Amino acid sequence: MAVTFSDLSSPAGLDSLDAYLLSRSYITGYQASKDDLTVFSAVPKASLASYVNVSRWYKHIDALLRISGVSGEGSGVTVEGNAPASDVATPPAADSKASAADDDDDDDVDLFGEETEEEKKAAEERAAAAAAKPAKKKESGKSSVLLDVKPWDDETDMKKLEEAVRSVQQEGLTLGASKLVPVGYGIKKLTIMMTIVDDLVSVDNLIEDYLTVEPINEYVQSCDIVAFNKI
């Protein structure tokens, strides 16, 4: 279903987008798509400080563009006064490529000249200072996961199935929104969002050691990973 936003360069438009993203990670669906790119290109970065949800989403999409690009199709989105995003987003080209033409005019500049004694001494001092500082604890990354949980048959109590799934507690695991999706022949599956701390939770182990063992396997037949995105 297509989504429409008013002028995102105005406070009213940003207020509307901020409220929309309160319970969503992406503009449409459960993974980054062209819809996110359309809105991303219309949002003025300098105005995000007052909009917590827009700022969170903007930084996430910006990181995806730098790392791997965005190619999801999306459901369609319209931003008043803004042109649609290109078909497939790719990571930004390196600065060296963007300035290749200018380099032709700088043949007389020695870009790779030898370091002076002063530069070497300064580099050594910086290295010594860095070595003297205590190592900072590396922050663990997080991922957003969309999981399909399938029952045994149409007689499975889906309410109890969801209660069983939500009873799973593990450090670094946060369960989010869920919904029942018809599969066919009267059978429904549970689709549930979750956020995991990468260093603490393995989705494969979560499925094998928690969701498909007793007593939960009384309701759960199998689980499939539908989407997995770094946050």
UniProtKB/Swiss-Prot annotation:
Stretch list, region Disordered: 75-136
Entry-linked InterPro entries: eEF-1beta-like_sf (IPR036219), EF1B_bsu/dsu (IPR049720), EF1B_bsu/dsu_GNE (IPR014038), Glutathione-S-Trfase_C_sf (IPR036282), Transl_elong_EF1B/ribsomal_bS6 (IPR014717), Transl_elong_EF1B_B/D_CS (IPR001326)
Bias type Acidic residues, positions: 101-117
Source domain of life: Eukaryota
GO MF, any single term: translation elongation factor activity
Pfam families: EF1_GNE (PF00736)
Entry keyword annotation includes Protein biosynthesis: yes
Function statement: EF-1-beta and EF-1-beta' stimulate the exchange of GDP bound to EF-1-alpha to GTP.
Assembly description: EF-1 is composed of 4 subunits: alpha, beta (1B-alpha=beta'), delta (1B-beta), and gamma (1B-gamma).
Name used for this protein in its record: Elongation factor 1-delta
Origin species: Beta vulgaris (Sugar beet)
Lineage per the UniProt record: Eukaryota, Viridiplantae, Streptophyta, Embryophyta, Tracheophyta
